[in-house]
């Protein structure tokens, strides 16, 4: 009887797990199949990671905290009108800049994609039932240490030097400013990130993918409401 119940429990848990994965298959994107539908929920590095000596999968609890803190530090700097850089600068103050909070579902989807080792490539569909989801990717390496998550996020922040608030996002400038504009998109509320740290060709690489809900970077829309 105990064995039968144990088997039943395993079957039920398996069905629940499969149904969760199948839910993502119901989420449709015009650009393609959802990441979790295509690859499942495993965050184990895929065969595409061959040749990379994986040291860690996913951000630590401390790194999660730092990711949220760095996003909000920079968002509030911009919101208060203290960001002097730009093309031209300074950036105007904002009246609708939310403080971001961590979202585990966004992080899970980001980690599934990061673990495919499709380096610096965006996945085709990462939405949730709640959100259209935006994405930023960063990659940096050093010969003697893994670059910090803060350093990676600052790569996105530094794109502000090329941004003109009055022009906004265009097809022409998106490649230069799109990470910055997603970082400070006023209506975005939540962030969740996946990461890999690995050694390749004697370099210590830190690869970071952050998903944002709701997404930003809509052409023709201001990145935030100017105060």
From Swiss-Prot:
Recorded family membership: Belongs to the CRISP family. Venom allergen 5-like subfamily.
Sorted UniProt keywords: Allergen, Disulfide bond, Secreted, Signal
SCP domain: residues covered: 69-212
Tissue: Expressed by the venom gland.
Pfam family, one: CAP
Superkingdom, taxonomy of origin: Eukaryota
Signal peptide: 1-21
Entry keyword Disulfide bond: yes
A Gene Ontology cellular-component term: extracellular region
Compartment(s) where it occurs, according to its Swiss-Prot or TrEMBL record: Secreted
Protein name, as recorded: Venom allergen 5
Membrane listed as a keyword: no
InterPro entries per the UniProt record, alphabetical: Allrgn_V5/Tpx1_CS, CAP_dom, CAP_sf, CRISP-related, V5_allergen-like
Disulfide bonds: 25-37, 29-125, 49-117, 193-210
